[in-house]
Amino acid sequence: MSKIKQPISYPIFTFRWLAIHGLAVPTVFFLGAITSMQFIQR
């Protein structure tokens, strides 16, 4: 009974985690690139 209810809640949490990380990782990378570019220009 507990195993049937767990897989339903697990994919939703995984999808949300993937969406947050998928958006956060490139944003941090982009911010780092902008900061690096400004440091090189200065």
UniProtKB/Swiss-Prot annotation:
It holds the Pfam family Cytochrom_B559. Keywords: Chloroplast, Electron transport, Heme, Iron, Membrane, Metal-binding, Photosynthesis, Photosystem II, Plastid, Thylakoid, Transmembrane, Transmembrane helix, Transport. InterPro entries: PSII_cyt_b559_bsu, PSII_cyt_b559_CS, PSII_cyt_b559_N. Heme binds at residue 21. It is a single-pass membrane protein. Its cofactor is heme b. With its partner (PsbE) binds heme. PSII binds additional chlorophylls, carotenoids and specific lipids. PROSITE patterns: CYTOCHROME_B559 (PS00537). It is found in: Plastid, Chloroplast thylakoid membrane. This b-type cytochrome is tightly associated with the reaction center of photosystem II (PSII). PSII is a light-driven water:plastoquinone oxidoreductase that uses light energy to abstract electrons from H(2)O, generating O(2) and a proton gradient subsequently used for ATP formation. It consists of a core antenna complex that captures photons, and an electron transfer chain that converts photonic excitation into a charge separation. Heterodimer of an alpha subunit and a beta subunit. PSII is composed of 1 copy each of membrane proteins PsbA, PsbB, PsbC, PsbD, PsbE, PsbF, PsbH, PsbI, PsbJ, PsbK, PsbL, PsbM, PsbT, PsbX, PsbY, PsbZ, Psb30/Ycf12, at least 3 peripheral proteins of the oxygen-evolving complex and a large number of cofactors. It forms dimeric complexes. This is Cytochrome b559 subunit beta. It comes from Guillardia theta.
